[in-house]
């Protein structure tokens, strides 16, 4: 978990990946071999292999651009009770054979609820109910406060189960809203 500041946050799933392209369903075959060779030639073996293992970003660019591995989403607030969630799969230039796979993955992952995982929809619904709670505070974001550290780049980092990213987003939103 990384809080980059100013509401920008990242969930780093890469420690859970060991092999190349695990984040893409362990893709293989001649198309993959050709793509790997081209990127290794362009970027060097070490950089290319790291990218293939780590996968794309899982991040929120404040206020509403979400990069969810192979999906791109924009959340457009309409009112306190409603928002529009636009999403599209990320397509790659130069490997059209993969774009069909990326589209199918987006359809499977994003589904009719427009969330990456069914659990996310449940969580969003519970958060919406929390907006109507008559108790204060209705939302607690303390998990992992004791594990947060600051890395050499000035980012607040913590364990994958911590709420560092939530705190970073809401901290910045509060500062922006109180300045308005």
Annotate each predicted stretch with a short phrase.
Residues 1-180:
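C-terminal catalytic domain of Rieske-type non-heme iron oxygenases
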């Amino acid at each position: 978990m990384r809080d980059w500041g100013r509401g920008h946050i990242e969930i780093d799933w890469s420690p859970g990946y060991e092999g190349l392209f695990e984040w893409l369903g362990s893709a293989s075959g001649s198309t993959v071999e050709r793509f790997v060779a081209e990127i290794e030639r362009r970027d060097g073996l070490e950089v290319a292999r790291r990218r293939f293992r780590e996968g794309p970003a899982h991040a929120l660019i404040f206020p509403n651009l979400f990069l969810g591995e192979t999906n791109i989403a924009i959340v457009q607030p309409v009112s306190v009770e409603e928002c529009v969630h636009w999403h599209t799969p990320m397509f790659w230039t130069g490997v059209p054979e993969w774009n069909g796979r990326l589209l199918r993955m987006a359809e499977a992952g994003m589904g009719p609820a427009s969330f990456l995982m069914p659990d996310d929809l449940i969580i969003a619904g519970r958060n919406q109910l929390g907006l109507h709670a008559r108790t204060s505070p209705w939302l607690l974001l303390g998990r992992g406060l004791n594990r947060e550290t600051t890395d050499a780049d000035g980012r607040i980092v913590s364990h994958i189960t911590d709420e560092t990213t939530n705190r970073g987003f809401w901290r910045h939103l509060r500062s922006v809203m109180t300045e308005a």
